[in-house]
Amino acid sequence: DDLIALPVRMLEEHADVRALAQDRWRYVHIDEYQDTNELQERLAGLLAEKHKNLFVVGDGDQSIYGWRGAKMENILNFEKKYPNAQTIILERNYRSTKNLVDAANAVIEKNKNRKERYSTTERVAGEPIVVHMARSAEDEARWIALKIRELMKNGTKPEEVAILFRTNFQSRALEEGLLHAGIPYKL
């Protein structure tokens, strides 16, 4: 935190240092703005204050770092804080199928603390979404192995299959499930 807290303090307390920094970094670009914390937002504001060249990219629907201090309010209140900013809302999803985009819209629209927007796609419906509620990590691993077996039976090569998981500890049950099913894998 000191890597941000100390520069913020210096810029707030020393106008000469702030002016030098603002002239050195005339353009401030921030990606994943929805995941910035209070200090990061203050630093951006201090640096951009003179030249008003602040460019941020973010999606309030994808804010995931609240647990480590990110303030989604930074993106939700951006237009209030910077009333002369131009906002470009990107609603077209070029990667996902219609089924996935529609499901995502249905889930996220229930969040009342967000800016209104609705994603669209030109892609076809695609495969139906499958939700499986496993009773345990082992049950989940068995189900995943079964689905991979079905894919392989229908011609999918093992190297064309990927399993994504959020944390490393989840890999143990998956590895055991794949080993038990005789499915080759690389971690």
Language-model segments: which ranges?
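Conserved helicase NTPase motor core
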Residues: 1-77, 90-96
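Helicase P-loop NTPase motor core
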Residues: 83-86, 91-184
